């Protein structure tokens, strides 16, 4: 019988690959990559947001609280983010366990590289790719400029299909100086 460390390592590698496959599938079904905007006209300008907006970024995986172990396994695997219980039921009958990563560095150095190496398989892959584009703009500190904010809004409006394009255009038109109509604000790339 072989009892070398190589056998143990091979078993661990196989288990890791199985877990990674499970994780990618789980995020395909239950994960979300989101970009949002928070209006902060006064406070934002004091903190370098000349646009009056803060760009919010988040990766989240949600499950019913009975499955909290799955969400905690994901947190343990990545080693970043946090797990919390969300008591908002919305369309659910139970509390929700939510794993989320909001930290820019954690997203750029852990989450994005993982899903670039192990791609998602559903339409969520497109949302991830758009999310990664936005995060790269943010990492270059271009999100604090009008041009960068507009670029992120243009990308974000193609994600998740929750906010209609017109709403994002209105937000930018109303709060971005020197623009007179939506054609001046959002241009296709």
Show where each model-derived region lies:
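Sequence-level preference for short, compositionally simple segments enriched
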Residues: 1-189
């Amino acid at each position: 019988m072989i009892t070398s460390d190589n056998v143990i390592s091979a078993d661990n590698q196989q288990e890791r690959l199985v877990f990674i496959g499970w994780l990618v599938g789980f995020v395909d079904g239950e994960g979300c990559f989101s970009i949002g905007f928070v209006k902060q006209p006064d406070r934002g300008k004091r903190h370098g947001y000349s646009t009056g907006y803060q760009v919010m970024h988040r990766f989240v995986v949600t499950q019913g609280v009975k499955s909290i172990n799955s969400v905690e396994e994901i947190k343990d695997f990545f080693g970043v983010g946090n797990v919390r219980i969300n008591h908002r039921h919305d369309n659910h009958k139970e509390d929700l366990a939510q794993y989320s990563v909001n930290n820019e560095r954690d997203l750029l150095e852990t989450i994005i590289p993982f899903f670039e190496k192990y791609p998602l398989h559903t339409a969520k892959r497109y949302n991830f790719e758009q999310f990664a584009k936005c995060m790269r703009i943010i990492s270059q500190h271009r999100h604090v400029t009008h041009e960068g904010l507009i670029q992120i809004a243009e990308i974000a409006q193609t994600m998740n299909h929750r906010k209609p394009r017109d709403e994002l255009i209105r937000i930018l038109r109303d709060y971005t100086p020197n623009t007179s109509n939506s054609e001046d604000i959002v241009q296709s790339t």
